Swiss-Prot record:
Record protein name field: Histone-lysine N-methyltransferase, H3 lysine-79 specific
Originating organism: Debaryomyces hansenii (strain ATCC 36239 / CBS 767 / BCRC 21394 / JCM 1990 / NBRC 0083 / IGC 2968) (Yeast)
Predominant subcellular localization, coarse grouping: nucleus
Subcellular location: Nucleus
Biased composition, class Basic and acidic residues, residue ranges: 473-487
Sequence similarity: Belongs to the class I-like SAM-binding methyltransferase superfamily. DOT1 family.
Gene that specifies this protein: DOT1
EC number in record: 2.1.1.360
């Protein structure tokens, strides 16, 4: 083994002072200095002349500090006397070069033989106070470690004169740990000088050119292998950063540029490019290089995808995703690329773990493995996913384990008593003990106090002890010992045991409960009947959401009036049987009635004075408010043509394209059903007559999702499209399929039938209310009839001439109905004649009134009745397959098992399919008028307002399908910073944008748009000319893109116009010219500055400088601080006139339930006078 460490240099110490006793401290003093004051003065004079410099080991930065005087026998002693000379320019430049390359003692003394080491160190600190480690210093340190890793670094301190002990020890331990990782690794091809050279280049230069120059006998692959074993970091040094910027500026291909940095992975290079992208002078270059970088990664990903066995990867995604199996199956392939390929194949890192992963995780937890090793062995899982799975596998991992029930009881008693009475309180002393446990390796670094040097006279005087004082001390010690003996004789109190504590607490519990008597030994507790308190008022039944405020108050009044009837009061007071005659009310009864009436009047006044719901937060279409259109077109352009028609859409049987950036739409939208299936633990079964959420798989005997529990709802404009739901009841605030179905009914009314109050009543009473009643009464047959009515109504009323076939879209779930329970909705059931007549009428002929009865009015056309056969194979029935009615003969019906509807069968799929009779039935149906389509589109053209409830529900439908399931990730940001995610609810956006009078000709922008809710709402509800937003968070930006794609497809299905959106995602608005240009042109600006700090507020003010007068800025905090005065800085704050407002609704933001204040700042033409 070669020895590459510098040999110890022997220095001759020439004492200047003639007195050997005074030179024992190894201080260099002029001749004749003998006293301590003379030494101090002489040291100070030498420091003033620049000859004496304290040892660099001292932590003091002041060279004149007396406290920095330490033993300099090794560092300041030289083989020649101290010379009084100045530094020439050549020597200074040479020393500057040494500061960059080599600061070892051997290099400094050889370069400046006529200078003392103390003078050299002082000059170095004058030239550069903060010193970086040089390459040769690290080379020397690495050589010391490689030769003798157990050597103490203090023995080699003299070789590093510019480093103090703590800094040197820290560096020594860092490289020692790095070299220690080579133990057990075959590195016989490497010599010690080569390893030391590689270590010296870590923080200096690891480019390809430098590596080939320093290590000519090694290729790049060998160097990569050794650096991987040593776990050398891949951060850019200063030299590498400069070279990276230069090479990126050139026109060389990206592959050649990356080849110059062989030890830097692509992620590190990409992060460096992103930092360059933040600089305005490099933005164009960085953007171009980032595009090249992405294409390079995609090409590599494609090559890897073509080279590996995808079938094998699919198998491993289901069975084994441990790192060991993946590395053996795909040797040499990066786990990052494998994970990207797996995600393209539908892999979800938060999904179910494979059996091999679970076995490994359990084994690792049993062996108490570290979390880092578990993460390394599960490369396809994130740290958050692994921690969540660990908590679910071993939820009681940190709980105390008791050997018996008595130990557990005593443990509980101990903590219970300490919390309530303080008898056995114990405080954890580890934090105090940790201060006393000093590491052994640092004990040698503690500086020993210097010995006190006293004169002979001072020593003699110190030895003399006053006799009187000694006698007094002896007397006091004797008294103290006597008191200690008395205290020792006293008997200590008997400590309270845990059992006694339990008895005391049990006695206290008995004294406050039951008959409040403490039980004695052998006594039993008396049983007393529990006191029952009867409520004075009746509990109100839950009302369906389709009742408006007026109807609810009227129903409450009726119920309360019934409660004060004399018969009911008499019935409550009477204790006789029902056969006795009714008695007249006496004076006492009448007084009771009057008291009840008074209490009821108070309740009525309270209900009438109850705060009304905010008009900006409608609950349903009965409490809806309207937003004026101001002449803008709400629907697609085809609606406003001379011959209106729904635009043609391309449908495809692919459930994934709903969240893809393409023009095609899935024939069946399964997003809502997928959410329920992926989070089925958050749902429970519907009432017993409804299909169960899960069933038992007969093959595996495990619970699986019920494949028959599927319900589909058609759309009006495109009845061939349907939305799929799984019937289940959410346990908390998850997506509710029943509410989604009811809201979809109301959406169709608001968009296509809002001109008719009769149709509103039909939607509310015969669809929404019927669904509520069917669930409350546990009637699945009634529920399915409502769904069938709606699907057939959509088919009959659609203005789109499409062939949707004759198949039953709800065939699976209809298997839970017997043939006698299947009811075919007729024209009368779906009120088809009323719909036709209401659509034929004009707005003047059909004024909206909530009091209109649901009866067919006198139509403006002759309603044609015809006898026709329906539900035959060749008919146009598009709801169900041929089904027999109850009046048909039942001879051909198959036998039905009597216990099919039994509770025991709930959760199982019917084994025998139901055979249906194909006999036809003669019914009377209404025929669609010839001018139906023109009148239908006429109502859409004549719309002058849009439903606020409709707009908000469209946005909430998108939000619940995209954002709600990812809300936890949105909150994984540092608290109380500008990146904290907080949502402005739709009611807030509606109110504030109405307050600023936002109109279609305006432009809107949201600085900090989050997932894009306010930007979407400004475009959809107010129809602005352009709606934009900027967001810096990666996950929120991704959700914005997904919401945009899904929203555009939902708008197309509803016939609404595409929104004009302009987002700047995954980027900051600070020093962003593109965002600033878009903001300057807008008319209304929203800034959620609730958690902006002073610096960010100042940056926003400078960014907004140049807004045109009249622009409105909405913020949650006032931009203008108290006593603000205008300055020379170019900021918009000097031109703002601020008004404070308060929300009318309590629930308007996500972080509080209180009414939130907000500020509207208007830009003025000149600087406001109050700021001058």
């Amino acid at each position: 083994m070669e020895n590459i460490a510098h040999h110890n240099t022997t220095y001759n110490i020439t004492p200047i002072c003639s007195d050997s006793s005074e030179c024992s401290s190894m201080e260099m003093l002029p001749l004749g200095c003998k006293t301590h004051s003379d030494k101090s003065d002489a040291r100070r004079n030498l420091m003033d002349t620049g000859i004496y410099t304290p040892d660099s080991n001292s932590d003091s930065s002041d060279p004149r500090s007396d406290s920095s005087c330490v033993d300099v026998s090794n560092s300041l002693a030289v083989s020649h006397p101290i010379s009084f000379c100045n530094w020439t320019d050549e020597e200074s430049s040479l020393l500057t070069e040494h500061i960059k390359t080599d600061l070892t003692s051997e290099a400094l003394t050889s370069a400046f033989p006529n200078k003392s080491l103390a003078l050299i160190i002082r000059k170095i600190h004058d030239l550069q106070p903060v010193l970086d480690w040089t390459k040769n210093e690290i080379y020397l340190l690495a050589g010391i470690i490689l030769n003798d890793s157990n050597s103490a670094i203090r023995r080699h301190k003299h070789k590093f004169p510019c480093r103090n002990v703590s800094n040197l020890n820290k560096k020594f331990q860092h490289y020692k740990n790095m070299v220690r990782r080579l133990n057990g690794v075959d590195h016989s091809k490497w010599t010690k000088p080569e390893i030391a050279s590689l270590i010296s280049l870590i923080d200096y230069d690891l480019t390809k050119t430098k590596l080939q120059k320093e290590l000519p006998n090694k290729n790049i692959e060998e160097i990569k292998d050794l650096t991987n074993e040593m776990r050398i970091h891949s951060n850019f040094s200063h030299v590498e950063s400069v070279l990276f910027e230069q090479t990126m500026t050139e026109n060389d291909p990206i592959e050649i540029v990356l080849d110059q940095f062989p030890l830097k992975n692509k992620e590190t290079c990409k992060k460096r490019l992103l930092k360059l992208n933040e600089l305005s002078q490099h933005r164009d270059m960085a953007k171009r290089r980032l595009d090249e970088f992405e294409s390079l990664i995609q090409n590599e990903l494609k090559q890897i995808k073509d080279s590996i066995d995808l079938t094998r990867l699919k198998y491993l995604l289901v069975n084994d995703l441990t790192g060991k199996q993946l590395r053996s199956s795909f040797p040499g392939i990066s786990m990052k690329y494998l994970k990207l390929i797996a995600k393209e194949m539908g892999f979800d890192e938060a999904g179910e773990y494979t059996l091999a992963e679970m076995n490994f995780l359990k084994k690792a937890l049993q062996e108490n493995a570290k979390l880092k090793s578990i993460i390394d062995e599960l490369p396809f899982r994130s740290q958050l996913s692994i921690e969540t799975k660990i908590n679910s596998v071993e939820p009681n991992r940190r709980r105390s384990v008791f050997t018996s029930q008595v130990d557990e009881l005593l443990y509980m008693a101990k903590w219970y008593s300490s919390d309530n009475f303080g008898n056995l309180s114990r405080r954890r002393n580890s934090r105090y003990a940790s201060k006393l446990d000093k590491p052994k390796d640092k004990a040698s670094d503690i500086m020993q106090p210097s010995k006190l040097h006293l004169e002979n006279e001072e020593v003699t005087e110190a030895k003399v002890i006053p006799h009187d004082k000694g006698v007094e001390n002896m007397i006091s010690d004797h008294k103290l010992k006597g008191k200690n003996n008395e205290q020792k004789k006293r008997k200590s109190k008997k400590p309270t045991s845990m059992v006694e504590v339990l008895k005391e607490e049990s006695a206290y519990f008995q004294s406050v409960t039951g008959n409040r008597c403490v039980l004695k030994e052998g006594q039993k507790r008396k049983r007393e009947r529990l006191m029952q308190i009867k409520l004075e008022t009746k509990l109100k039944k839950p009302k369906s959401q389709n009742l408006n405020e007026t109807n609810r108050i009227q129903e409450t009044k009726k119920l309360m009036k019934c409660d004060v009837e004399p018969d009911k009061v008499k019935e409550q007071k009477s204790f006789k049987s029902e056969n006795l005659k009714e008695a007249k009310l006496d004076a006492s009864d009448s007084s009771i009635v009057s008291d009840v009436e008074i209490s009821l009047k108070k309740k009525l006044n309270k209900i009438e004075n109850e705060e009304k719901r905010s008009p900006y937060d409608p609950e349903d279409i009965s409490t809806d408010t309207l937003v004026p259109l101001y002449g803008r077109q709400l629907y697609v352009n085809e609606v406003y043509e001379t011959q209106p028609r729904p635009p043609k859409l391309s449908f495809r049987e692919d459930t994934n394209i709903m969240v893809q950036n393409c023009s095609e739409i899935s024939l069946t939208d399964t997003i809502a059903a997928d959410i329920i299936s992926q989070h089925c633990k958050n749902y429970r079964d519907m009432p017993i007559s409804f299909p169960s959420l899960t069933i038992v798989d007969r093959n595996t005997n495990r619970m699986i999702l019920n494949p028959m529990n599927k319900i589909r709802i058609r759309f009006l404009l495109y009845p061939q499209h349907s939305e799929l739901f799984i019937l289940a009841e959410p346990k908390s605030n998850e997506l509710d399929p029943i509410n989604e179905i009811k809201k979809l009914f109301q959406l169709h009314y608001s968009l296509f039938f809002s001109h008719s109050s009769k149709l509103k009543k039909i939607i509310l009473s015969e669809y929404n209310k019927e669904i509520d009643i069917s669930i409350e009464e546990n009637d699945f047959v009634r529920f399915m009839f409502v769904i069938d009515k709606w699907n057939r109504l959509m088919v009959e009323l659609t203005p789109n001439d499409v062939d949707i076939g004759s198949h039953d879209i709800n065939e699976e779930i209809r298997a839970y109905l017997s043939p006698n329970e299947i009811k075919i909705p007729s024209d009368e059931d779906i009120r088809l004649d009323i719909f036709y007549s209401e659509i034929q009428l004009s707005t003047e002929e059909n004024p909206i009134s909530d009091n209109d009865p649901i009866e067919p009015s006198s139509p403006s056309f002759d309603l044609i009745k015809s006898m026709k056969r329906c539900f035959t194979h060749d008919s146009s029935n598009r709801l169900t397959p041929p089904i027999s009615s109850e009046e048909d003969n039942k001879e051909n019906e198959p036998p039905i098992e009597s216990d099919f509807r039994n509770n025991n069968n709930k959760g199982s799929i019917p084994c025998t399919p139901v055979r249906l009779n194909t006999r036809n039935k003669m019914v009377v149906n209404a025929v669609k008028p010839e001018n139906y389509e023109s009148n239908f589109f006429r109502h859409l053209k004549e719309k002058t307002s849009v439903s606020r409830f409709c707009v908000q529900q469209i946005l909430l439908r998108i939000y619940s399908r995209i954002v709600s399931t990812e809300s936890r990730k949105l909150r994984s940001y540092k608290a109380f910073t500008a990146e904290v995610y907080g949502e402005l609810l739709p009611s807030f956006t509606s109110e504030v944008l109405t307050k600023v009078n936002l109109q279609p000709q305006h432009k809107f922008y949201d600085l900090g748009s989050g997932v894009g809710n306010t930007t979407f709402q400004a475009a959809l509800e107010f129809g602005v000319h352009l709606s934009g937003g900027c967001e810096i968070m990666e996950h929120a930006s991704k959700l914005t893109e997904l919401q945009t794609m899904l929203l555009n497809k939902h708008l197309a299905l509803l016939g609404l116009k595409k929104l004009p959106l302009n987002f700047a995602l995954s980027q900051s608005f600070v020093e962003n010219d593109i965002v600033r240009q878009a903001v300057i042109e807008c008319d209304v600006l929203l800034v959620n500055n609730y958690l902006f700090d002073v610096n960010l507020n100042t940056a926003v003010g400078k960014m907004l400088y140049g807004l045109k007068p009249g622009t409105k800025i909405i913020s949650l905090r006032n931009f203008i601080r108290p006593r603000y005065k205008a300055s020379s800085d170019k900021t918009i704050f000097d031109y703002l006139k601020v008004e404070r407002h308060e929300m009318s609704n309590y629930l308007s933001v996500s972080w509080t339930a209180n009414k939130v204040p907000y500020y509207i700042s208007t830009v003025q033409e000149n600087i406001c006078e109050e700021y001058v």
